[in-house]
Amino acid sequence: MTDNILFAFALTLFAGLSTGVGSLIGLLSKEFNPKVLTISLGFSAGVMIYVAMIEIMVKARESLVVGIGAEMGKVVTVLSFFAGIFLIALIDKLIPSYENPHELNVAQKLEECSENQKKKLMRMGLFSAVAIGIHNFPEGLATFMSGLSNPTLGVSIAVAIAIHNIPEGLAVSAPIFYATQSRKKAFILSFLSGLAEPVGALIGYFLLRSFFSPSLFGVVFGAVAGIMVYISLDELLPAAEEYGEHHFAIGGVIAGMVVMAISLLLFT
């Protein structure tokens, strides 16, 4: 059991720290390529949608059928899915749009900024870090519990969320870097925002460990699927189309689905 806990936590840490990877990519890149970002965001959406609908929803239903029976299991699976959508939509609603990391135009040329603009960018970057931390908290718990219940599923979710977190790291680091001209500050704040995932995993584990059961895991899986679909449709795909052509975004989605389908066939 201890090995399972450590493995699940390692997956969560991996997913969370990918925010720092996104920050590094943005800070070290000499030239912004919108096509690459468009394809990457589409790829992330494809991975998340495919994993959510093909893998996670199936696991949610299987767990709930074991826990509460076939008929109620089906109903609770669907309810859990939409509960996850409602939860992440509520979080988005509570965060004003200018503070939402997915609303930032990181492609904008900001080299020449006034002092007021720099202050605004710094505030935007800090709010983005907090917003991403709030988003990452339930994602961390979801990754951890998935890894604890089913290591293969946990890996799939961790990879999907890690890919999703990379552009978020860029969203935090870009405005902070342009405001301070400090790569170090931009990276540290982006890195810290990603640590919300392992923190969410630890807090969730200590609060819920006495309630672990197939039913609980099923509800969590259903909610995770809803969260991942919402993020893909509400955040990743619109952002992908904002930075590039529609066909590049859709190509990224299909590529993400193909890659995840092949990986699931090979490793499950």
From Swiss-Prot:
Main location, first listed in the record: membrane
Membrane topology per record: Multi-pass membrane protein
GO cellular component, one term: plasma membrane
Residues passing through the membrane, by range: 5-25, 36-56, 75-95, 124-144, 157-177, 187-207, 211-231, 248-268
Binding site for Zn(2+): 139, 164, 168
Subcellular location: Cell membrane
Record-listed Fe(2+) binding positions: 136, 139, 165, 168, 197
Name this polypeptide is given: Zinc transporter ZupT
Encoding gene (name): zupT
